[in-house]
Amino acid sequence: MTKIFRYILLSFVLMMLVACGKPDSQKAFEKGFKETMTDINKKMNEGDNEATKMMAKILEKATYKVNKVAENGNVSELDVTIKAVELTKYLSEFMLSLKPLIESNMREEAFTKATVDYFSELSKKDLEYTETNVKVHMEKIEGEWKVINTDDILVGIFGGLEEFVRAPHN
């Protein structure tokens, strides 16, 4: 009797493992999110601009949670919540802190020092976060899942800073 019970239990556990796997589109999204975060970090750490490097440290705090996946053939929609530092608030504060320097015709060195000082202090603070709910649209192209609306994900990563993401890049 115990052998039969073990086989039934083992079969049940095996079926649960197979049934509880993540959909392929979710796996592709998770892999792509990690790659995007790595690319952003890598690009922002190039060169010797300390303020940009500090900003990269702030951005790498972004996380995500996949709430729901609706996969239908070659299309998929993921309901994702991206939690990131609320950059809109902090960049507004930064611009206000620069106002006296701008009015006094600051030099580039003063701007650089003020920027580094601000982001250095910011990295020591307990930062506020914002959550952005994103409907991620994916399509299976040549056997691989691809995100269609990448800008929406970037807005979430940049803490709702839509102007930065959607601005024309030269």
Each model region followed by its residue ranges:
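Bacterial signal peptide processing site
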Residues: 21-23
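C-terminal motif of bacterial Sec signal peptides marking the signal peptidase cleavage site
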Residues: 16-19
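N-terminal, intrinsically disordered, polar/charged segments of Gram-positive cell-envelope systems
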Residues: 26-56, 109, 165-166
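Short beta-strand edge/turn micro-motifs at domain boundaries
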Residues: 131-166
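Bacterial N-terminal signal peptides that target proteins for export
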Residues: 1-8
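Mixed-charge, low-complexity intrinsically disordered segments
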Residues: 86-130, 168
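Beta-strand elements of well-folded, non-transmembrane domains
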Residues: 82-88, 140-142
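Post-signal-peptide N-terminal segment of Sec-exported extracytoplasmic proteins
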Residues: 40-79
